[in-house]
Amino acid sequence: MKMIRAILRPDKVEEVVDALSNAGHVALTKMDVIGRGKQKGIRLDNIYYDELPKVMLLLVTPSEEIDDIIEIINETAFTGNFGDGKIFISPVEEAYTVRTRSKGL
């Protein structure tokens, strides 16, 4: 199993979630976050914004589905501009469902 953390532009998130859902990847968590990447914030007129609002999607999925999910996120979230986002992949050793106390996804 793998965990995907995708940090994306807020205005692209619903489109990404819909695309993932249409491909059968429906289980995820969304969180509003703030942060910055290599661009170190943004200047608009005389105002400098050190950190920008983003949304983080968390998905835990079987390892064999990773490439499909990454492709969907990359294709759907892409604008070609700074701040499109980042995708991080981590291993997940185990997962449990609290309601059923079952192990696995």
UniProtKB/Swiss-Prot annotation:
List the GO cellular component terms: cytosol
Question: Which species is this record about?
Answer: Methanobacterium ivanovii
Keyword line: Nitrogen fixation, Transcription, Transcription regulation
The GO annotation for biological process reads: nitrogen fixation; regulation of nitrogen utilization
Q: What does this protein do?
A: Could be involved in the regulation of nitrogen fixation.
Gene Ontology terms, MF aspect: ATP binding; enzyme regulator activity
Segment forming the signal sequence: none
PANTHER family, per the entry: NITROGEN REGULATORY PROTEIN P-II (PTHR30115), PII-LIKE PROTEIN GLNBI (PTHR30115:SF13)
Q: Which SMART domains match?
A: P-II
Task: Note one Pfam family from the annotation.
Answer: P-II
What is the name of this protein?
Answer: Nitrogen fixation nifHD region GlnB-like protein 1
Q: State the similarity comment.
A: Belongs to the P(II) protein family.
- InterPro entries given in the database record: N-reg_PII, N-reg_PII-like_a/b, N-reg_PII/ATP_PRibTrfase_C, N-reg_PII_CS
